[in-house]
């Protein structure tokens, strides 16, 4: 269960452009170029292109054209404020518009960042684990719009805007491999509490 914060206060903005003249995929984050050839971004781009080919989209750009991506956010990056979730949700939404993909973008956003599948929607959202081995049904769904609780406010105090020394992805992998408590939480605590929260949000 999660709550998507208002994009008026904290947001990511992303523009994408594809061209047959581009030699490689490139990305600029807050004005600084970063690698687009490895890691989650490369995997995300590949997944979106494969989805576009499978859907037979009628976009005016070819899936083998390279893309240039410009993204910026107005809050600290990699500092524990879900910048990856916001960034990948925004990026995949833009890519789906570029390639004419009309299907749910939640599963594609998850390829970049797990939490991004939730950030695609506003309001109150639940991320469903799914059963497929390829994770294709591990998607999010909106339970209630933001208007369900108009008086809700979130106070965020940034103690440090420096990048974390350990990324969220690596930290979670380490926790999965070393923590018995995390396994208990995933098997027992999360399902029970999610069902309680679900009954409250949809009532």
Per-segment meaning from a language model:
Residues 58-155:
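Gly/Ser-rich oxyanion-binding loop with an adjacent helix/lid
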Residues 43-47, 118-129, 188-195:
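Charged/polar, low-hydrophobicity segments characteristic of intrinsically disordered regions
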Residues 146-203:
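C-terminal nucleotide
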Residues 9, 36-39, 86, 104, ...:
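Conserved active-site and cofactor/substrate-binding residues in soluble primary-metabolism enzymes
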Residues 53-58, 107-111, 162, 195-202:
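Noncatalytic linker/hinge segments flanking ATPase motor cores
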Residues 1-79, 93-102, 135, 159:
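ATP-binding N-lobe of GHMP and related small-molecule kinases
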Residues 43-50, 107, 111, 174, ...:
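Charged/polar, solvent-exposed surface patches and flexible loops
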């Amino acid at each position: 269960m999660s709550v998507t914060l208002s994009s008026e206060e904290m947001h990511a903005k992303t523009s994408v452009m594809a061209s047959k003249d581009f030699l490689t995929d490139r990305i600029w984050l807050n004005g600084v170029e970063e690698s687009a050839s490895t890691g989650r971004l490369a995997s995300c781009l590949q997944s979106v292109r494969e989805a576009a080919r499978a859907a037979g989209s009628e976009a005016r750009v070819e899936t083998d054209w390279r893309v240039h991506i410009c993204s910026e956010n107005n809050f600290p990056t990699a500092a524990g404020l879900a910048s990856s979730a916001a960034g990948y949700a925004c990026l995949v939404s833009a890519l789906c518009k570029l390639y004419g993909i009309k299907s749910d973008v939640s599963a594609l956003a998850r390829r970049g960042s797990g939490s991004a599948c939730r950030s695609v929607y506003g309001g109150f959202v639940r991320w469903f684990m799914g059963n497929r081995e390829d994770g294709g049904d591990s998607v999010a769904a909106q339970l209630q719009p933001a208007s369900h609780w108009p008086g809700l406010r979130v106070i965020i105090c940034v103690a440090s805007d420096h990048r974390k020394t350990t990324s969220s992805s690596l930290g979670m992998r380490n926790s999965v491999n070393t923590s018995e408590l995390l396994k208990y939480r995933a098997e027992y605590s999360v399902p029970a509490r999610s069902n309680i929260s679900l009954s409250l949000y949809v009532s």
